[in-house]
């Protein structure tokens, strides 16, 4: 039972008779929401047509159907004047280039170059007749034997066509985006290396300039340094001599003071010993007593 039996003929005509490319053109539904049937709303939803109550067109899963993807920027090629060695023969042995698109084919898998060789002699239909006859001959003579599941090849071909026409555009765009990200990553590494090389070159240039300035001012700087060293050595020697003279003067002063003190002590000791020796004699004591008695007598008179 088809869906057309559930809707009126007018609704059926509006649902299934739609111009090609309506999904990508974002057509507008009729202004009256009541005139849109249930199945027609489903059809508009699948085709990406906004309803009167919607301000923006919904994102449809069939927007990318039957679209041919083309790269906004081709793959980078090797420069013509690039050689990794001067002896490299670029004429006979050029660098291999990575094609952006696969080579042109016919019947999904046969190279176009096989057909163009026949067209010069047999015309446009000649290659198809030749390969068709060759295929029929191989199958008829059982030189090319199909397996029991050989008929499933038709299903795989249909599946390939379905996937390539529905999701092929998004797959190609995603792969190209991943490729650009990968190339950007490697370019970032190259830029970092170049930045390090530039920084190293700048640092080397600054060091070279500083060495040149140092070389130019080396005699003057050496002379100034020598004068400073001589002055420092002179001040050090003067300070050493001053300390040594001060130490020797203090030593001589202490020596003289010690010598004078020793002589004074010895002299006092000698005097004391002499006095004590004289006082201890009896004659001296008798003379001293007589002298004292006479003085007392003189005082009494």
UniProtKB/Swiss-Prot annotation:
GO cellular component: mitochondrial inner membrane; mitochondrion; non-motile cilium; proton-transporting ATP synthase complex
GO molecular function: proton transmembrane transporter activity
Segment annotated as transit peptide: 1-21
Record Pfam families: Mt_ATP-synt_B (PF05405)
Record keywords: CF(0), Hydrogen ion transport, Ion transport, Membrane, Mitochondrion, Mitochondrion inner membrane, Transit peptide, Transport
Inactivation phenotype: RNAi-mediated knockdown results in sterility. RNAi-mediated knockdown does not affect the timing of hypodermal and vulval development.
One annotated GO biological process: proton motive force-driven ATP synthesis
InterPro entries, per the entry: ATP_synth_Bsub_B/MI25, ATP_synth_F0_suB
Superkingdom as given in the UniProt entry: Eukaryota
PANTHER family in alphabetical order: ATP SYNTHASE F(0) COMPLEX SUBUNIT B1, MITOCHONDRIAL (PTHR12733:SF3), MITOCHONDRIAL ATP SYNTHASE B CHAIN (PTHR12733)
Family from the record: Belongs to the eukaryotic ATPase B chain family.
Protein name: ATP synthase F(0) complex subunit B1, mitochondrial
Organism: Caenorhabditis elegans
Taxonomic lineage of the native organism: Eukaryota, Metazoa, Ecdysozoa, Nematoda, Chromadorea
């Amino acid at each position: 039972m088809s869906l057309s039996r559930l809707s009126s003929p007018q609704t059926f005509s509006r649902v299934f008779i739609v111009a090609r490319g309506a999904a990508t053109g974002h057509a507008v539904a009729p202004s009256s929401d009541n005139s849109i049937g249930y199945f027609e709303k489903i059809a508009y939803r699948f085709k990406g047509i906004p309803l009167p109550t919607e301000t923006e067109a919904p994102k449809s899963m069939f927007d990318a159907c039957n679209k041919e993807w083309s790269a906004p920027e081709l793959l980078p090629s090797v420069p013509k004047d690039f050689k990794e060695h001067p002896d490299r023969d670029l004429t006979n042995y050029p660098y291999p280039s990575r094609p952006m698109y696969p080579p042109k084919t016919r019947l999904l898998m046969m190279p176009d170059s096989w057909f163009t060789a026949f067209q010069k002699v047999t015309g446009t239909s000649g290659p198809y007749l030749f390969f068709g006859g060759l295929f029929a001959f191989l199958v008829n003579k059982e030189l090319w034997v199909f397996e029991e599941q050989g008929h499933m090849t038709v299903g795989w071909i249909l599946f390939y066509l379905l996937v390539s026409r529905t999701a092929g555009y998004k797959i190609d765009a995603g792969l190209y985006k991943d490729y650009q990200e990968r190339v950007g990553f490697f370019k970032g590494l190259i830029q970092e290396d170049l930045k390090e090389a530039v920084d190293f070159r700048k640092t080397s240039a600054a060091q070279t300039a500083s060495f040149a300035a140092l070389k130019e001012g080396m005699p003057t700087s050496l002379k100034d340094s020598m004068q400073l060293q001589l002055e420092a050595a002179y001040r050090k020697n003067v300070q050493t001599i001053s300390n040594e003279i001060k130490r020797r003067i203090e030593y001589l002063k202490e020596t003289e003071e010690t010598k004078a003190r020793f002589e004074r002590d010895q002299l006092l000791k000698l005097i004391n010993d002499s006095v004590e020796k004289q006082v201890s004699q009896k004659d001296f004591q008798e003379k001293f007593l007589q002298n004292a008695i006479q003085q007392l007598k003189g005082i009494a008179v």
